[in-house]
UniProtKB/Swiss-Prot annotation:
<dbReference type="InterPro" id="IPR008991">
    <property type="entry name" value="Translation_prot_SH3-like_sf"/>
</dbReference>
<keyword id="KW-0689">Ribosomal protein</keyword>
<dbReference type="InterPro" id="IPR001147">
    <property type="entry name" value="Ribosomal_eL21"/>
</dbReference>
<keyword id="KW-0687">Ribonucleoprotein</keyword>
<protein>
    <recommendedName>
        <fullName>Large ribosomal subunit protein eL21</fullName>
    </recommendedName>
</protein>
<dbReference type="GO" id="GO:1990904">
    <property type="term" value="C:ribonucleoprotein complex"/>
</dbReference>
<dbReference type="GO" id="GO:0006412">
    <property type="term" value="P:translation"/>
</dbReference>
<dbReference type="InterPro" id="IPR018259">
    <property type="entry name" value="Ribosomal_eL21_CS"/>
</dbReference>
<comment type="similarity">
    <text>Belongs to the eukaryotic ribosomal protein eL21 family.</text>
</comment>
<dbReference type="Pfam" id="PF01157">
    <property type="entry name" value="Ribosomal_L21e"/>
</dbReference>
<dbReference type="GO" id="GO:0003735">
    <property type="term" value="F:structural constituent of ribosome"/>
</dbReference>
<dbReference type="GO" id="GO:0005840">
    <property type="term" value="C:ribosome"/>
</dbReference>
<dbReference type="InterPro" id="IPR036948">
    <property type="entry name" value="Ribosomal_eL21_sf"/>
</dbReference>
<dbReference type="InterPro" id="IPR022856">
    <property type="entry name" value="Ribosomal_eL21_arc"/>
</dbReference>
Length: 99
């Protein structure tokens, strides 16, 4: 019978932090606010387990659709399909304006 290997399967290198960046992330990442329509990058912080999106969405860029409690809804395009990722603010980075 097949077994599940957990949500963090095959993330040994993907979720690694640099040696000097290890430990908890700063509080400012937890309290950052976003506006609906703002572009954000999904950058998973492995030291924060709550609100962590699935590993497939690491590195993708999406648009904030809304908020529910402490989590944010991020709309992304995955292989031509529109999907909604639910993640906490520790796993999101605002996109810098290129203009």
């Amino acid at each position: 019978m097949a077994r599940s290997h957990g949500e963090r399967l095959k993330t040994r290198h993907k979720f690694n932090k640099d040696l000097r960046a290890r430990g908890l992330s700063p509080v400012s990442k937890a309290v950052q606010e976003f506006e609906v329509g703002q572009k954000v990058h999904i950058d998973i912080d492995p030291s924060v387990h709550k609100g962590m999106p699935y590993r497939r969405f690491q590195g993708l860029t999406g648009e904030i659709l809304g908020q529910a409690g402490r989590a944010w809804f991020v709309g992304i395009s995955d292989g031509g399909k529109k999907k909604t990722v639910i993640a906490r603010s520790q796993h999101l980075k605002p996109q810098k304006n290129s203009a």
